[in-house]
């Protein structure tokens, strides 16, 4: 087909008009995100824009983002190698709901906090002393680190005033968390903060947490299931200490090859704790606590029990979750006079076996309570 001069000029004129048409101004927080670009989001619409554009970003910077009430900052399914950077202060609208407030997943993901940043849960809006036990005041969990694979990292985050549990680590492997600070000290006021666990780990492999500082009102660390887990260089204050379990009653009931070391537990309810669910089945094997310093422990310096239930301990330990290969090396410190130095409640000598305890010295509390404890322990 031969185009006449008038047709060509008409076509070019139309194209020129189209190019000259004004482009609508981008709303606050939104960015055009061609695949592999560095994306930045801010303000009240930043969360929605980040969620919509995440697939096309090689890096995502969140600057003073305000996440709407009842909305998860959903950064799941990120492209491999994506970097996520928190800048300024990240806040969340108030609503009674289960959360989470933040969720991130992917392979080789790098999450970090810029200098001076803060992720502020403003938990006092929910705190009522009941934590996640309330049926009327539902509180959002904070940060789901689920299905983070490869060599993913979470580095240098500053988190304040979580409504309830902070980090839920599930279905992840090869994840390293370093230099995280969780400051829930405000929850101590009138004992309103509750169930504010620092790190809950389940169904995960090869998880490393180093240099964490945790002020809270529940477990600093709780490993409910998982293998090849390292926690070192931690500081835990005000909560329930370092916990294995409770183990049992879940789809995955195996905790194996865990090394917890060089950590201080201060002004907490418990120091070192291992909990097996009464009547359940599972495995706790190859757990080591090394170079743990305790001070101001109010209830149990070291407690290892096979009769845990949600309502407390039954006093009649069972044997379905054997605790084997447990090592305590240089675990030392003080318990208050109303607490107990060491409690061991095992269902039988066979269900608690292969333990190695060296340089264990806990004092200041009531006399040890020991049932079917391996020799050389208490």
Curated annotation (Swiss-Prot):
Keyword check for Cell wall biogenesis/degradation: yes
SMART domains per UniProt: PbH1 (SM00710)
GO cellular component, one term: extracellular region
Matching InterPro entries: Glyco_hydro_28, Glycosyl_hydrlase_28, PbH1, Pectin_lyas_fold, Pectin_lyase_fold/virulence
Presence of the UniProt keyword Transmembrane helix in the record: no
Catalytic reactions on record: (1,4-alpha-D-galacturonosyl)n+m + H2O = (1,4-alpha-D-galacturonosyl)n + (1,4-alpha-D-galacturonosyl)m
One example GO MF annotation: polygalacturonase activity
Keyword vocabulary terms for this entry: Cell wall biogenesis/degradation, Disulfide bond, Glycosidase, Hydrolase, Repeat, Secreted, Signal
EC number: 3.2.1.15
Pfam families assigned to the protein according to its UniProt record, in alphabetical order: Glyco_hydro_28 (PF00295)
Highest taxon of the lineage: Eukaryota
Gene Ontology biological process: cell wall organization; pectin catabolic process
Signal peptide start-end: 1-20
Covalent S-S links between cysteines: 39-57, 220-236, 346-352, 370-378
Active site positions: 218, 240
Assigned protein family: Belongs to the glycosyl hydrolase 28 family.
Protein name as annotated: Polygalacturonase
Organism: Penicillium expansum (Blue mold rot fungus)
């Amino acid at each position: 087909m031969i185009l006449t001069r008038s047709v060509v000029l008409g076509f070019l004129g139309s194209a020129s008009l189209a190019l000259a048409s004004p482009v609508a101004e981008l709303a606050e927080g939104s960015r055009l995100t061609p695949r592999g670009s560095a994306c930045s989001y801010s303000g009240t619409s930043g969360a929605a824009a980040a969620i919509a554009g995440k697939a096309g970003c090689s890096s995502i910077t969140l600057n003073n983002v305000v996440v709407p009430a009842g909305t998860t900052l959903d950064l799941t399914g990120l492209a491999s190698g994506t970097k996520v950077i928190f800048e300024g202060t990240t806040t969340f609208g108030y609503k009674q709901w289960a959360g989470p407030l933040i969720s991130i997943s992917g392979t080789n993901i790098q999450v970090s906090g810029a200098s001076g940043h803060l992720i502020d849960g403003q938990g006092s809006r929910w705190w009522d002393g009941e934590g996640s036990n309330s049926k009327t005041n539902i509180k959002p969990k904070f940060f789901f680190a689920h299905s983070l694979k490869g060599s993913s990292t979470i580095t240098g985050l500053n988190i304040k005033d979580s409504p309830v549990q902070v980090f839920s680590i599930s279905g992840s492997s090869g994840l390293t968390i370093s230099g995280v600070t969780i400051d829930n000290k405000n929850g101590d006021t009138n004992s309103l903060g509750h169930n504010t666990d620092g790190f809950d780990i389940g169904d995960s492999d090869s998880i490393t947490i180093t240099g964490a500082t945790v002020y809270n009102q529940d477990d600093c660390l709780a490993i409910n299931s998982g293998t090849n887990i390292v926690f070192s260089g931690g500081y835990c204050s005000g909560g329930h200490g370092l916990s294995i379990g409770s183990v049992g009653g879940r789809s995955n009931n195996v905790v194996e090859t865990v090394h917890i070391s060089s950590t201080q537990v201060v002004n907490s309810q418990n120091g070192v704790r291992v909990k097996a669910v009464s009547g359940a089945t599972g495995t706790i094997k190859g757990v080591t606590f090394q170079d743990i310093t305790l001070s101001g422990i109010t209830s149990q310096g070291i407690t290892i029990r096979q009769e845990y239930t949600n309502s407390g301990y039954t006093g009649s330990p069972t044997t379905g979750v054997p605790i084997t290969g447990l090592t305590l090396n240089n675990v030392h410190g003080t318990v208050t006079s109303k607490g107990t130095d060491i409690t061991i409640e095992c269902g039988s000598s066979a269900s608690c076996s292969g333990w190695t305890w060296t340089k264990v010295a806990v004092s200041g509390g009531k006399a040890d309570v020991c049932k079917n404890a391996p020799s050389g322990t208490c």
